[in-house]
Amino acid sequence: MKRKGLLKISLKAARINANLTQQEVADKIKVSKHTIINWEKGKTRVGYAHLKVLSEIYDIGMEQIFLG
C-alpha cells in the first residue's frame, strides 16, 4: 500500500514539475483526463507502456516515477 501512495505522489509531482495540466497529459497520450486523475490518485494502475510514455513526457527516468 505504501508503494501505491508513492506512485500517486510521484506522478502528480512529475506532471506539475513539467508544467502540464492533467488535460494536456491526457491529450498527449490519448487517454481521458479521468484516467490521469485515477492514476494520480492511485485508483487504477498505470501500465508499462503508459509509464514509459509518461517518463518521456515528464523528462524523467521510469525508475524515478517509482522511487519519487
Annotated model-derived regions:
Residues 35-37, 41, 60-61:
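K/E-rich alpha-helical interaction surfaces of small helical-bundle regulatory domains
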Residues 49-64:
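DNA major-groove recognition helix of helix-turn-helix/homeodomain DNA-binding modules
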Residues 19-38:
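Short alpha-helical DNA-recognition segment
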Residues 1-17:
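A short, Lys/Arg-rich alpha-helix, primarily the initiator
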Residues 14, 28, 39, 68:
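Residues in the recognition helix of alpha-helical DNA-binding motifs
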Residues 16, 27, 56:
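Alpha-helical residues within the helix-turn-helix
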